[in-house]
Every structure is written in structure tokens, then in C-alpha cells.
Amino acid sequence: MKHWRNPYLVVRVDGVALVDFSNNEERIFKADELPDALAKLPASAWPYGRVVAVQENSVQGGTQDAVLIRRNRGILAGTLESMHVLINWVPSA
């Protein structure tokens, strides 16, 4: 998905990461911080319109991690829906 040009998010145990492929960076946000972070992105970060790619972190340490990721995924999906942003779910590696 390195050719994806809209925001790319990874659901993690500790929140949601906004991936910047050009700098090989991940900025981690709590669910309530994500709307502001996405709103601060320039219009050029949204060439496909109001859609983001979302992937779950494939590295999990057990049942508790899976529960936290599932929780964060649900919060993220609800947040993006309330912002009228579509989700392109990407399978975990």
C-alpha cells in the first residue's frame, strides 16, 4: 500500500497510528485525538477524497492485545463514520 496517497492508519494496542510513508514514520494518536490530526492534514493529503486506508497491527501479544485492538478498531470506525470518512480496510500482513 505504499502507493496509497490518502491517510493510512494502523490500529494498534495503544491507539491508532497515522503512517507517513514518505518519511517512514508513524505518529500514534488516542482515538479522541485523531479527528484533529486528520483535520490538520493539507488538502493535498486527500487526492482520493474522504477515504482512508486502515489496517490492524498484525503483531499481537495475546488475548488482551486482541481485545484492545478490537476496541480501538470499533472506536476508530465510529469516529470516521461520524466524520463522513470512508474506510478502505486493508488485510493485515
Question: Each PLM stretch: what is its role?
Answer:
Residues 1-93:
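Long, low-hydrophobicity, acidic/polar, solvent-exposed interaction domains
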